[in-house]
Amino acid sequence: MVKKTGAKRCTVIFAHPGFHFYRKPFEFSHFKFDKDIVDKIINIETHHCDPITFLGPGYGGKLLFIDEAVQSGWWLAPISSNDSHDYRNVPGKSRIGVVAEELSQKAIFSALKKRMTFASSFPIQLFASALVGDQQYPMGSHIPTSETLKIICDFVIPEEEKVGLERIEVLINGKVKAIKKLRDVSNADLTAVPQSTASGARPESGRIVIDINKPNIPSSPGYIYLRIFGYKAGKLIPSPIYVAPFYLK
């Protein structure tokens, strides 16, 4: 429809892929790449109602939906659906995190088009960046190939959420290449930075720095993204945070 109508000012997402099993034969399921509209389709849902749906393999049975779409050529960032399909019409717990310069329509749409988003099942402020040499790139960026690469993740969790981060997974070209446990990492990797809020609560915050060693740095084309799991009351939260990929150009 985007291509047929020639719409110039629009943004489109791949919404809840694979969710409606009963109508799967009629769903746009192949993620066929189209260079004429690649700049218009900007997001893919990784959380929708039942998060378990998106932890399983995608249409091909081997990769997650986000990986199938990205490996088809799309430049995408993850988002969540906030609707709950609840008869009481209450919002779901999933969140879309948009890293914008200010709280305005223009800034939010600019961030969306730059793919500076993340998807989470609980409120968290998060910003990931890639450090290539001395140049820093925000999440969703196309970054140059290099012999050195660091992924930096800054986060703030409101204290009232009582949620901790359990582990972080580094996925390179759709495969988990590293798992970092966050409960027992050294202070060099995770530094608490207390910050005050208007309510006086002190959120948990920190910075996670991950060195991607040379053998694991993908060549072009390639991509890297983070998947972060949380825990609450000692139990693992099954729906992870998805951070927008960094694309190797």
Model segments located where?
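Extended, charged catalytic domains and RNA/DNA-binding interfaces, predominantly
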Residues: M1-K249
